[in-house]
Amino acid sequence: MSIEQNRDFRLQGSRRASQAPYEGATPISRREAMRRGLFGAAGLLLADRLGFCAPAPSQPAAGDKPNIVIILSDDLGWGSVGCYGADPKLVRTPNIDRLAREGRRFTDANTASSVCSPTRYALLTGRCCWRTSLKYEVLNVNAPLHIEPTRPTIASMLKQLGYRTAVVGKWHLGYQSEKTDYTQPLRPGPQDVGFDYQFAVPSNHGDATGVFIEGERVAGLRSATLNPAKYKNWRGRNQIGLDAPQRVDEDVMPTLTEKAAAWLRQQEPGKPFFLYYAPVSVHNPITPSAKTKGSSPAGAYGDWIHELDRSVGAVLAALDEKGLAKDTLVLFTSDNGGEFFGEEQAAAQAAGLKPMGPFKGDKHTIWEGGFRVPYIVRWPGRVPADTACDEMISLTDTFATIAAFVGVPLPPVKDAAEDSFNVLSAWLGQERKSPLRPHMIVHSADGVFAVRRGPWKWIEGKPAKPKPPEARRDEFHPQLYHLGSDIGEAVDVQDSNPAVVAELNALLNRCRERGYSRE
């Protein structure tokens, strides 16, 4: 069976399923089903294939300048929030669920990579990070700025349209032109790729810098003196030892939350803005604040999810207080899937939480659990409320979609946004006769490629990392899965589908060699 014969499986499957869910069933709304707790993680996938893709009220006019807020959570698995099937007895996410109730929830949203830096690069530029010098893993704490200052980003595009722009939260895309010297001005940096304001954790939660960045300098830097032995991080390792106020892990999320909300409160109606807010939860170390500690039966990891939800609520409250909600598009998602590593995660799973929902694998891996993430879009009156969609999309599509959203033509495919597809019609709930994305390439922490097209997922199985971890050896060989019938990637069907393998392998090579995948 060829790819062409299966290309439209999603739409065909939706049509078949919508004809007769099951004999004797009494139809109920998705909202009522969620209220009754009828959808687990796998059930939500099924529900979205039963026709919950409603038409949008209206299309934005070219040149509209709505405010835009992107909330990119960290390591949040598909099944970690209520509107994606998390058990409400273990975790409650009323603010994220509010976004889903007031907006549109996607069940097949994917990150470009199953780790942090590459996804953040792809989100802002519309280009897969494996096209750069970073072929596996993430940027280290001293890495130079990874986005070329000449490369268009969402922020630089919007800034040219008169938007005020800010990044608050985890940056993890490097500073300066060579090895970062945190005692000096951190330029080039976010300001050189379109952001007017920055308040950031330089790399990761619990990273070796131990500090915040505000503007172009370490916040509160007193001198250029370094004392590496003075401070230890959560792993017991020496910090860089910067002579500046040190972050307290339990206070990082409240600090970022307040900075994001405060920046929003400074905005004035009629002057468009773009906030890229990247909270550090639910990345390790698991450090809920005093306000959420002990709030979840799933333990500290559940508390950490609550911390994220509380932060989302503060952002939404700031928009409400300023009367900006109706004029603001909010996109909530995650940089990759959840992570199994850690005592707190293990305790949460032992309690019954399923952070990756029905998917195999987690962060770092080539399996679906590494890429499938929550993805919710809200824009009152434009994005249809309380709807869901199973269109295959990528976070890399954010650039092209926002460009269409504000009426800006994309640059030539060889110049920018090389891997970004316009999925605005999916955001708006408009009917589509064929998939918006004919294919999608994903990439693991070890540099393993996979390509999806229709129901098929082809894993090339060749790690770029010189010494990949033995624990992930089952990813390091070619394999083919039919996700339409095997969402858990349990049965390799390459031997019975040689034509599909040949087509997908050729597609992957073509997209790599020509320098772009956008069509």
Report each predicted region and the residues it spans.
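Formylglycine-dependent sulfatase
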Residues: 2-7, 13, 19-479, 485-519
